[in-house]
Amino acid sequence: MEEEIRKDFLELMRLMDEGKIQEFKQKANETPPVDIAEGLEEVEDSGRVLKLFRMLPKDISSDVFAYMTSDQQQLIAESATNAELTALVDDMFLDDTVDFLEEMPANVVKKVLQNADENTRKLINQFLNYPENSAGSLMTIEYVDLHDYFTVRKAMDYIRRTGIDKETVYTCYVIDEQRRLVGHVSLRKLIVAPESTYIRDIMDTNTVSATTTDDQEVVAEDFRHYDLTSIAVTDKENRLVGIITIDDIVDVITEENTEDIKKMAAIIPSDEEYMDAGVMHLVAHRLPWLMIMMISATLSSTIITSFESVLAGAVVLTAFIPMLTGSAGNSGSQTSVTIIRNMALGEVELGDWLRVLWKEARVGVVCGAALAAVNFLRMMIFSGTTVVISLIVSVTLMLAIVMASSVGCLLPMGAKRLGLDPAVMASPMITTIVDAASLLLYFMIASVMLGL
């Protein structure tokens, strides 16, 4: 926790402990809800967590609750009275309530639903039925919708009356009499337009939207591609049912990037926070791929064993194996990360595989030649090896870099073609293939050049 945030939170705790209620509420109103929630994460005493939360002003307690960890949310939900729980759910945005309930055990979900009003309960159940990680599970129904026959005056009056309870008023979505999405209009355009103008005359009909079943990664890509702050969500009949705002998509992007990074490092993704995870939990998510890579490394051992005669004739070759496999592995990893990232951004398509291969092969040739030249001079000057040995190692290094660059681009694209996650191929598969291929190249070149 940053020093300034920690200082503000400690001040809140001091005011709470000293019973200075008015000063506490004033300080709480001046502190961002997310900072209060972050401070509560470090409080181990559940009694103090409950006490501080109950002292918060009612107009910010729901915002703080939305940012709290699922464990602390469960603590508060189980400890709250029916009246407190009803007030909390009523004050929260619906999408935040659904996010909270998705992490809760059945007894907490039941308690929350029992204390929600009938309409809210119906909406929550509807949201919980949407597929996980879909646009429907992310959206909120707290948005401003305007009929196309509204005048600007009527639209502004409507926004003033209802806008306080909406997640955003900066983009208003326009619907027809059947609630079908027909366009959108910005608050800026409403402010500058004459009051007698009809919404249909100033709205933008080129509206980007998602359906309730769209995957959250697709929605996130739309936000990035079109520079959106919100997106409309429609059903199969193009009727407006909700919107997704940028704050929820930022969370999605963070989750997806974290998941991809873990996969690329051969770690099974987990939703649990690192500091909250137990040792055996971390072991369970790392050990499977470590086992797979250890067993697959047998291929490299087999290759070395097969060329024992070459090594016996030139033992010095053994010293350069780590450098060759390490350099090739690094090159393959650089290429795979670049390709995976560009595929995720939509800048590289499967149909581009030949162009990508040609480009990466040329990059590999240039990088490999540069490394080989430097390595040859290094070996001649500092290692004291013969010209032949220096050439064997340097030529192998260049070819291994070219090979690794090619494998690094083809494996992720091949994985995507087969419907697999390209990130899974980044570290474990590339390491195994590149190591084995580099050793094979090394010993074959050595056999030819040494006549063994």
Region spans (language model):
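Membrane-water interface of transmembrane alpha-helices in multipass transporters/channels
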Residues: 306-321, 383-395
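Hydrophobic packing positions in regular secondary-structure scaffolds
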Residues: 1-268
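Non-transmembrane, extramembrane segments of multi-pass ion/lipid transporters
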Residues: 248-282, 333-356, 413-419
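Interfacial loop-to-transmembrane junctions
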Residues: 414-434
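Alpha-helical transmembrane segments in multi-pass membrane proteins
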Residues: 289-297, 320, 324, 328, ...
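Soluble-to-membrane junctions at the N-terminal ends of transmembrane alpha-helices
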Residues: 275-291, 350-369, 393-394
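Membrane-helix cytosolic exit motif
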Residues: 336, 411, 416, 438-450
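Juxtamembrane "helix exit" motif at the C-terminal ends of alpha-helical transmembrane segments
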Residues: 294-311, 372-385
